[in-house]
């Protein structure tokens, strides 16, 4: 049976349909907004796998290029490995949905959102999250939703729900928010140095609209008559749990007071082994032994949270708002164009900057067409950074997500391309990690950019905030959380910015939402922490280096008429190749007539720029030029005085004395000085070597 409902979501009319397509999925909805058509489907296994002790959720967002009437690129002409922007939207769907499944529900769930028809004006991220929530809400799969997503922009101080792709270009805020009817559950985005108050205002605006779409989903589920599956939870052995707590509580409490991550992990491991060995004497059932390991983890969770909430004590002895010790190194590597090492506690990031030219732009394909990026930040998280052994492979979703967050934090303080025409790549190598490595990447990246001579608007620092709360409403906000506090806490909120304001943010929860009072505390405490970090960073470097590294390319930019680009390129690229061969410089020509000239040194770049100028310079009568003899005739020599512009130096104008043969004085390939005597209406140029010699 087909069910349809429609409703207004800001300026958009949303139509939801189910019961016609993908009927064998456990939940499926066709979601429409304008010409945008999404298909969201979800399926779940009937039972958890034997021994499963975590929730295996997979969220996949896919853009089909047929949705805009285009073929995929490449040899096979079909969609292949998901590009970075699809992975990022997949994460936007995953992160707010994951904590809303019942605790202890370990059945495998696969959620897919596909773009079947695209609308160039419609930004997809918020709609994709909405479609995913609808599919789950109308399915029989247990889910403590619905939630809704909203993308928020701001133009001239006015907040906009779900801005168009054109509007977002002019917005000083790009925020994606997910929430329930009453609480925010996820935020992500970037801003042009917005204040805490402006950010909170945008979140309140989003929450109001989110509640509207949540209500629509509730009405839809009621119309369909959804009946959810019963959650099958494993029975707990209360008696065994009490015995484990009695034996292990003091031991785990002592082990948790160790501030060093490596030592602490070893001590916790030793306690766990001791407890298991002790109970093996009286417990023979292998499943009960597995339960003991689960109870030990729960006990550790209880100990860490009790210390923070009731004693105001963190495992490493810090105050709730205290930041770990910070150290900074500037340009520790001699080869790269700029580098830094930022260490905060046991988290360490090596930031490295490479400056490139237009040909180094990253090109990628989206539903809107081919795009280019001139700034990129790549985040690497090797196994050794956490003392583990695992196979090295390409970047996973986590690395891509962390790199994107750090990239957005730094992107908005970069100079305009007119001021600094370089392509910039920042790499963050995580050398060791104990929480907040993405924010360490922001700090090391900011330092390395200044060290490389990139004139950024100001230093950028990032901090990760945590939250511990209980059912009574009591809560504690933690600054600069370590890995343990991230693992056992309720929130991981990353905020990056300058002294003027916030540039990037990301918040994930393990609870069903936080109030605005809590968010206000988080933002205020994060700002104090950010300023503290900036104070330390700016003691080491507070402005861009005065000069670029010797190995960095030297770039000169020229702008030429768009309708004359072909003249510069020449037949088959002849002119551009000629300039490169003569000067050693490279030319990158854009469709708007912008020409980026890069050389290994300033002389090379200037020589090439002079040649480019020559293509578009007008020949001046009376001016002396240095030109190359291109051809010799009986009556004179043809000399190229500007690229593509030849004139005739008649035999009578070659020398002061009588010349019997032109070849007696000049040869092909010679560089000679000539004076322009005349340019006629047809463009013929009359040259004189003799007149030029007279003026030496």
Curated annotation (Swiss-Prot):
HAMAP family: PNPase (MF_01595). Coiled coil: none annotated. It holds the Pfam family RNase_PH. Belongs to the polyribonucleotide nucleotidyltransferase family. GO terms for biological process: mRNA catabolic process; RNA processing. InterPro entries: ExoRNase_PH_dom1 (IPR001247), ExoRNase_PH_dom2 (IPR015847), ExoRNase_PH_dom2_sf (IPR036345), KH_dom (IPR004087), KH_dom_type_1 (IPR004088), KH_dom_type_1_sf (IPR036612), NA-bd_OB-fold (IPR012340), PNPase (IPR012162). This is Polyribonucleotide nucleotidyltransferase. The lineage of its organism: Bacteria, Pseudomonadati, Spirochaetota, Spirochaetia, Leptospirales. It catalyses: RNA(n+1) + phosphate = RNA(n) + a ribonucleoside 5'-diphosphate. The gene is pnp. GO terms for molecular function: 3'-5'-RNA exonuclease activity; magnesium ion binding; polyribonucleotide nucleotidyltransferase activity; RNA binding. One of its GO terms (cellular component) is cytosol. PROSITE patterns: KH_TYPE_1, S1. Gene3D superfamilies: GHMP Kinase, N-terminal domain, K Homology domain, type 1, Nucleic acid-binding proteins. The keyword Metal-binding applies. Its EC number is 2.7.7.8. NCBIfam families: polynuc_phos, PRK11824.1. Residues 553-612 form the KH domain. It is found in: Cytoplasm. Residues 622-690 form the S1 motif domain. Involved in mRNA degradation. Catalyzes the phosphorolysis of single-stranded polyribonucleotides processively in the 3'- to 5'-direction. Its main location: cytoplasm. Mg(2+) binds at residues 486, 492. Keywords: Cytoplasm, Magnesium, Metal-binding, Nucleotidyltransferase, RNA-binding, Transferase. It comes from Leptospira borgpetersenii serovar Hardjo-bovis (strain L550). Its cofactor is Mg(2+). SMART domains: KH (SM00322), S1 (SM00316).
